[in-house]
């Protein structure tokens, strides 16, 4: 049991195949769920857990990328 938990601590979210956007959304959701009700509105005004990846589509607009690559070099 201890060996297994040490192995989990030594690896990061990238090692588990989680993209930065998924990591950012989970951290934002966690922050919103742990703050007091009176402070939650303040945090929700400045951050929402719905970050998406976008890239220019060539016509001056933005195209949303649904399947985000795990590694930055794959963009």
Curated annotation (Swiss-Prot):
A Pfam family it matches: ATP-synt_Eps
Sorted UniProt keywords: ATP synthesis, CF(1), Hydrogen ion transport, Ion transport, Membrane, Mitochondrion, Mitochondrion inner membrane, Transit peptide, Transport
One GO MF term: proton-transporting ATP synthase activity, rotational mechanism
Subcellular location: Mitochondrion; Mitochondrion inner membrane
InterPro entries: ATP_synth_F1_esu_mt, ATP_synth_F1_esu_sf_mt
Presequence range in chain numbering: 1-9
Source superkingdom: Eukaryota
Topology with respect to the bilayer: Peripheral membrane protein
Cellular component terms per the entry's GO annotation: mitochondrial inner membrane; proton-transporting ATP synthase complex
Subunit structure: F-type ATPases have 2 components, F(1) - the catalytic core - and F(o) - the membrane proton channel. F(1) has five subunits: alpha(3), beta(3), gamma(1), delta(1), epsilon(1), plus the additional subunit P18 (Tb427.05.1710) that is not present in F(1)F(o) ATP synthase from metazoa. Subunit P18 (Tb927.5.1710) interacts with the alpha subunit with a 1:1 stoichiometry; the interaction is direct. Subunit gamma is part of the central stalk. F(o) has three main subunits: a, b and c.
Family, as annotated: Belongs to the eukaryotic ATPase epsilon family.
Role of this protein: Mitochondrial membrane ATP synthase (F(1)F(o) ATP synthase) produces ATP from ADP in the presence of a proton gradient across the membrane which is generated by electron transport complexes of the respiratory chain. F-type ATPases consist of two structural domains, F(1) - containing the extramembraneous catalytic core, and F(o) - containing the membrane proton channel, linked together by a central stalk and a peripheral stalk. During catalysis, ATP synthesis in the catalytic domain of F(1) is coupled via a rotary mechanism of the central stalk subunits to proton translocation.
Protein name per its UniProtKB record: ATP synthase subunit epsilon, mitochondrial
Provenance organism: Trypanosoma brucei brucei
């Amino acid at each position: 049991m201890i060996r297994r938990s040490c192995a989990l601590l030594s690896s990061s979210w990238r090692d588990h195949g989680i993209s930065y956007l998924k990591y950012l959304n989970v951290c934002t959701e966690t922050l919103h769920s742990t703050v007091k009700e009176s402070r939650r509105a303040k945090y929700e005004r400045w951050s929402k857990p719905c970050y998406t990846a976008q890239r220019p589509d060539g016509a001056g607009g933005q195209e949303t990328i649904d399947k985000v690559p795990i590694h930055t070099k794959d963009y």
